[in-house]
Regions:
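Interaction-interface detector
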Residues: 1-93
Length: 93
């Protein structure tokens, strides 16, 4: 299956849709999205093999890194450029 994230003018993800599994390259799915829904769509991967992270509503698409990045959590202590994920302290139980 192909997964597509729609982003707004601020590169924020506003929705994520699933495409047909019979479209291996995603070209037909992308064309359908543009023709029927308009907007700006970026392909995302559920297993994170492209664009680092699976897009979620509220994530930001960073075109320089070509990555979907979650909103920074309040307890973030840094950002890992290798994974495009926020570093948060481990919670001890």
């Amino acid at each position: 299956m192909s997964h597509w994230a729609e982003i707004d003018n601020n590169n924020k993800v506003i929705r994520v849709l699933v495409g047909d599994n019979n479209d291996p390259n995603g070209d037909e799915g992308y064309k359908w999205l543009i023709d029927n829904l308009g907007g700006t769509w970026i392909k995302t991967s559920y297993n994170g093999n492209i664009r680092y992270n699976f897009a979620g509503i509220g994530y930001t698409y960073d075109s320089v890194r070509d990555a979907f990045i979650a909103a920074e959590p309040d307890n973030a202590i840094g950002f890992d450029e290798n994974t495009c994920r926020w570093i948060v302290p481990e919670i001890e139980l």
